[in-house]
C-alpha cells in the first residue's frame, strides 16, 4: 500500500481505469530497466482514467474528465499524478481501456517517422512488425501513403503483419535483405525502423535505398555486432 499521491501545481490526479503493458514494464518487473532517479518505482508508462483532483494552476482539465496519460511511471497504481501537458482526451469513439494502450506506441512511431521524414510512395521497413510499435508503424505509414515491408519470426506473426497493412512480410530467420530488395524492385527501403541495434546494423545498411534513412529505437540485439 502507498498513499494516494497529491497533485502539485500544474499536476493532475487521475483515478486509473486501465494501463498499457509495454516491453519496458516487463523488463522492470524482472529487475531490469530501472526508472530514472526521482521517479516512482511503481511501473506503468501509460494509463487512462478519470480526473479526480487538480493542482493549482491547472486550466486544461476538470474533475470528471476522461484522460489518457504518457507517464514516467506509476500507471499500474489505483491513482497516478501527471503534469497536465502529458494528458490527452481519448480519441473519439475509443473507450478508456483501448485508449490506455495507444499513447506509448503512437508517440514512438509518430515522432520517429517525423525524424525520418517518411513520404508518400516511399517504402518503410519495420522490424518486429507484429509487435505494438510495428503494428502501429505499419498502419501509420499506410495513412501517409507509404508502402510497408515488415519482418517477423513465425507464420502467425507474418499473417498479422499482412492483415494489418504490410505489403510484404518476411521471416527474419531467412535472408530478409534479399526479400526487401525484391519487394522494392532492387531499390531497398527508404526508411528503416529498427529495434535490434548492432545485430542488424550491417544487414540494415544493405537493405537501405540510396540516401535512405534508418531510425534505431531499440537495442534488443545488443550494442555490439
Summary of predicted features, one role per range:
Residues 183-191:
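A glycine-rich helix->loop->beta "capping" turn
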Amino acid at each position: 500500500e502507498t498513499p494516494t499521491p497529491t497533485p502539485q501545481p500544474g499536476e493532475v490526479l487521475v483515478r486509473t481505469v486501465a494501463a498499457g503493458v509495454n516491453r519496458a514494464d516487463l523488463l522492470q518487473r524482472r529487475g531490469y530497466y530501472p526508472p530514472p532517479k526521482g521517479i516512482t518505482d511503481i511501473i506503468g508508462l501509460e494509463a487512462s482514467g478519470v480526473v479526480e483532483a487538480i493542482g493549482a494552476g491547472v486550466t486544461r482539465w476538470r474533475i470528471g474528465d476522461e484522460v489518457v496519460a504518457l507517464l514516467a511511471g506509476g500507471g499500474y497504481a489505483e491513482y497516478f499524478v501527471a503534469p497536465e501537458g502529458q494528458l490527452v482526451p481519448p480519441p473519439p469513439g475509443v473507450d478508456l481501456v483501448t485508449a490506455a494502450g495507444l499513447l506509448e506506441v503512437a508517440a514512438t512511431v509518430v515522432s520517429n517517422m517525423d525524424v525520418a521524414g517518411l513520404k508518400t510512395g516511399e517504402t518503410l521497413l519495420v522490424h518486429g512488425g507484429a509487435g505494438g510499435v510495428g503494428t502501429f508503424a505499419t498502419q501509420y505509414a499506410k495513412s501517409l501513403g507509404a508502402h510497408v515491408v515488415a519482418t517477423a519470426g513465425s507464420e502467425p506473426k507474418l499473417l498479422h503483419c499482412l492483415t494489418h497493412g504490410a505489403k510484404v512480410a518476411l521471416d527474419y530467420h531467412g535472408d530478409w535483405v534479399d526479400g526487401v530488395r525484391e519487394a522494392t524492385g532492387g531499390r531497398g527501403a527508404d526508411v528503416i525502423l529498427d529495434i535490434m541495434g548492432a545485430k542488424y546494423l550491417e544487414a540494415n545498411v544493405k537493405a537501405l535505398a540510396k540516401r535512405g534513412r534508418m531510425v534505431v529505437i531499440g537495442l534488443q540485439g545488443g550494442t555490439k555486432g
